[in-house]
């Protein structure tokens, strides 16, 4: 079903966000659906709390270079490893 949609913006949560693995989740079904929507959208927004930064879950949703925005409550030191030219990091809760 997800492959029929071409959203301008896809907003998803992740169990882990890591420079090498990108955005990841623990469930195969969750990953399959999120990966399909993420791949079909013009921009991808990933939400991940500070405890999920640097963590790698079992299944990849998207590579870091394919994420447009990361919304997190992580500190500057926690997000330093994730910064890139393509990724805009939005810090909340400070």
Describe each PLM feature range.
Residues 1-94:
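Conserved phosphate- and dinucleotide-binding cores of soluble alpha/beta proteins
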